[in-house]
C-alpha cells in the first residue's frame, strides 16, 4: 500500500500504475483505508490499480466550504484527482454515500468512467432540503451518538455490529475517529456531515440517472439482501440495464462484512468491461 497527497486529497493506493484503474470512494465519515481488505484482493485477483482517497473533511483530507460538499462538486474533485494522477478513465466504486458521488461522477464525466459499481449506495432517495443550519444541527446529534468513552468501547461496538473483527478492520475503523475531550469521536465534524447531507438533498440521485442511462454505462448495484426493497426497485426502474446482486444475511457495511464477496463481485464486473 502506498499513500500520498494529490489534488488536495490524501490517497491510499494498491497495485501498479500501468494496470486498469479503480477509484474507491468510501461512505459518510469513512476513509480510503476502508478499502484495505478489498483493495489488495482486487489487485491480486483481477490485476487492478485501486486508488482510495479520503474525502474532503474525512481522515487526513482537509474540509472545504459547505457548497463544495454537493455530490456534483465532489465528483469534480474526483475528476481533478484523475487529472493530477494522469488517469484518463477508471471504474468508480462507491460505498454508501460514496455511491452518490460515484453516480454524479458518471453522470458528469461519462468519458472518464469505464464502469460504475455501487455497494449499498447510489440507490437511496433524498429528503427535502432543510437548510444548512438545520442539517448541521441534525448532524451534531448524530455525532454525539457516535462518540464513545474510549477506543475499547468503540472497537467492541464495531465488532458486534460487523460480526467480524480483524487487525485490518481495526486499522480502518480507527482511521475515522480521533480523541476529543477524553472521548473518541468521529473525525468528520457536524459541519462537514451537515453540509454533505444538505448537498445530497439539493442534488438528489434521480437527477443524475438519466445521463448515466443515456451514456449506456455498465452499472452494478450490490446490496445487502435486507436492503430497502422500494429503493432497489426505483433504481431498477431508472436504470433497467443495471446488474443488481444481493448478499444474503448482509449488513449495510458490506465492505467490512463481506470483503471477499465484494471484491469478487466488483472485480469480475470491472474485468468484464475491459
Which sequence ranges carry the predicted segments?
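Alpha/beta-hydrolase fold catalytic core
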Residues: 1-23, 44-48, 87-88, 248, ...
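Active-site loop/oxyanion-hole signature of alpha/beta-hydrolase fold enzymes
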Residues: 46-93, 264
Amino acid at each position: 500500500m502506498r499513500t500520498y497527497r494529490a489534488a488536495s486529497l490524501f490517497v491510499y493506493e494498491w497495485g501498479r500504475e500501468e494496470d486498469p484503474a479503480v477509484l474507491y470512494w468510501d461512505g459518510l465519515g469513512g476513509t480510503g483505508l476502508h478499502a484495505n481488505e478489498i483493495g489488495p484482493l482486487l489487485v491480486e485477483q483481477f490485476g487492478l490499480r485501486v486508488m482510495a482517497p479520503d474525502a474532503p473533511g474525512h481522515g487526513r483530507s482537509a474540509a472545504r466550504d459547505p457548497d463544495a460538499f454537493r455530490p456534483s462538486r465532489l465528483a469534480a474533485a474526483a475528476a481533478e484527482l484523475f487529472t493530477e494522477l494522469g488517469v484518463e478513465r477508471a471504474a468508480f466504486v462507491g460505498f454508501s454515500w460514496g455511491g452518490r458521488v460515484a453516480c454524479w461522477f458518471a453522470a458528469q464525466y461519462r468519458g472518464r468512467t469505464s464502469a460504475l459499481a455501487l455497494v449499498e449506495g447510489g440507490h437511496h432517495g433524498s429528503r427535502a432540503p432543510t437548510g444548512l443550519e438545520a442539517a448541521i444541527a441534525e448532524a451534531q446529534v448524530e455525532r454525539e451518538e457516535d462518540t464513545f468513552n474510549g477506543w475499547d468501547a468503540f472497537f467492541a461496538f464495531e465488532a458486534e455490529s460487523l460480526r467480524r473483527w480483524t487487525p485490518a478492520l481495526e486499522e480502518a475503523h480507527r482511521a475515522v475517529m480521533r480523541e476529543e475531550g477524553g472521548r473518541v469521536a468521529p473525525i468528520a465534524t457536524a459541519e462537514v456531515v451537515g453540509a454533505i447531507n444538505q448537498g445530497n438533498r439539493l442534488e438528489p440521485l434521480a437527477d443524475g440517472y438519466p445521463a448515466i442511462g443515456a451514456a449506456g454505462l455498465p452499472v452494478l448495484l450490490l446490496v445487502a439482501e435486507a436492503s430497502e426493497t422500494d429503493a432497489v426497485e426505483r433504481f431498477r426502474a431508472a436504470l433497467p440495464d443495471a446488474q443488481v446482486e444481493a448478499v444474503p444475511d448482509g449488513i449495510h457495511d458490506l465492505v467490512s462484512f463481506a470483503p471477499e464477496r465484494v471484491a469478487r463481485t466488483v472485480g469480475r464486473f470491472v474485468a468484464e468491461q475491459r
